[in-house]
Amino acid sequence: MAGDSNVHDHELSGLPPELAERIREEAAENDEIYRRRSADTLDLSRVHYFHSEMVDWAIKQMGNLKGARILDVGIGDGLTSVLMALAGAQVTGIEVSSVALARAETLAQRYNVGLNLQEMPGEDLRFEKDTFDGILCLSAYHHMDQKRAAFEFGRVLRRGGRLVMIDPFASNPPAWLYRRIGQIFSREATSRETPLRVRDLRFLREHFDKVDWRGMYFLSVGLIGLERIWKNPHPSIFRFTESAFKWTSPFDSLVLRVPGLQRVAWKIAVVAQR
């Protein structure tokens, strides 16, 4: 069940003070983001075309979900948790935002699936060693203390289990510009997020036997920026970007085959095997 308030002080008391404060800030800022979202968006048929493609790819990397014990880290509205539960997984979803958890609970109820929802940061997982068969973490790792989160992921994931992550890449030029002028756009972001670089994967390699990564998307970031110039884009703009994405996404896949360009992709997708 979702909690009624932000991450509680007593739950963060064992963490370094600076990390505890960072988590509190993330919780408060994410609460504000999710309060602005309409309840009408809690609908699997209304998922944004870009997010839908990204989620589909990530869930496929998780393998057979039937009966699998899955930890979904930073679940937001609960989209991925509900989709994996519908596929037969036993899903535990964690979030630092109580507002997001309440939305995720509503989504789960709408689709009649059971989720174990807990208010918890990825840097302090209150689970026993080897609890989970898989971990999914979409657009959340870059909000965390990466070294500590990597340790926690490796600890609670069983031997042979898989971690799948997608996060923004720090070195994509259009995305870098987009982040710098994000206040002009209706960009949902928190103040302490840190997009990943390839060298950041060293923390995962300390706890996982194999860590593979690939770049995802290149020019497509421009379509998202175009949409978000306005908080409520005209339907014709959305139709244009959705149609254009059908072309830019496969084009991006071709472009990113060129040696060296993987490092300037918009997103970095990681599959780590323990």
Where on the chain are the PLM-derived regions?
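Class I SAM-dependent methyltransferase SAM/SAH-binding core
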Residues: 71, 77-124
